[in-house]
């Protein structure tokens, strides 16, 4: 039986890392996963050895080597193509479950809505990079850009996080539009982490039990 593929999306500061860990702790004991299935947690960019190198280029390049906008898009696509072909597809084909911090939604939101690149072009690159692999469920941890910026105040920022509030607002709007798609669910990430996790549990159980 093919495994299930779950994705957490959201702007920087929304609490994805915390919720990914909580979900990874809960899922194996939830009764949703078949006996013998393993749970794999991963991220984009950086879910493979090649992806780690690309992540460094994308998020922490020397100033004079920062990728231009279209180059940035292509580097994210390369990271995803490697991730899908060498890690996601083999795991799912083996019956394992995959939980990913970011996937295609982030590219549409950040490079499409945030950077202003053509969404049709991004969709074409997505189809090439993923070979059609779509998540079974995508959870958008929705948090206002202002609150996200407050949460990250004083923390070291990577190149994307340092883009500023106006950029973050465009990305947030992108996620809001993407969340209207089938298999996307909105989570109120402004609540305390325990309450956010309760929402995540409910939405995962509801979404996957319908598909099982």
UniProtKB/Swiss-Prot annotation:
Any idea which GO molecular function terms this record carries?
ATP binding; dTMP kinase activity
SUPFAM superfamilies in alphabetical order: P-loop containing nucleoside triphosphate hydrolases
Which key words are in the record? ATP-binding, Kinase, Nucleotide biosynthesis, Nucleotide-binding, Transferase
Cite a single Pfam family from the UniProt record: Thymidylate_kin
Entry EC no(s): 2.7.4.9
Q: Name one GO biological process term.
A: dUDP biosynthetic process
- Residues bound to ATP are 10-17
Recorded GO CC terms: cytosol
Matching entries from PANTHER family are given as: THYMIDYLATE KINASE (PTHR10344), UMP-CMP KINASE 2, MITOCHONDRIAL (PTHR10344:SF4)
Protein's name in the database: Thymidylate kinase
């Amino acid at each position: 039986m093919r495994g299930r593929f779950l994705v957490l999306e959201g702007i920087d500061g929304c609490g994805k890392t915390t919720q990914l860990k909580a979900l990874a702790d809960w899922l194996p004991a939830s009764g949703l996963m078949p006996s013998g299935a393993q749970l794999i947690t991963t991220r984009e960019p950086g879910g493979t050895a090649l992806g780690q190198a690309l992540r460094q280029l994308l998020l922490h390049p020397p100033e004079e080597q920062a990728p231009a906008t279209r180059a940035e898009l292509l580097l994210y696509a390369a990271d995803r193509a490697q991730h899908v072909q060498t890690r996601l597809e083999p795991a799912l084909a083996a019956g394992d479950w995959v939980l990913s911090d970011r996937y295609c939604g982030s590219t549409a939101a950040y490079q499409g809505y945030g950077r202003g690149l053509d969404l049709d072009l991004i969709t074409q690159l997505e189809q090439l990079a993923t070979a059609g692999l779509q998540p079974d469920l995508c959870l958008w941890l929705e948090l206002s850009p202002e609150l996200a910026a407050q949460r990250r105040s004083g923390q070291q920022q990577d190149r994307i996080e340092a883009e500023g509030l106006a950029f973050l607002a465009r990305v947030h709007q992108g996620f809001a539009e993407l969340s209207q798609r089938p298999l996307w669910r909105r989570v109120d990430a402004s609540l305390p982490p325990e309450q956010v996790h309760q929402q995540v549990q409910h939405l995962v159980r509801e979404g996957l039990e319908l598909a099982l």
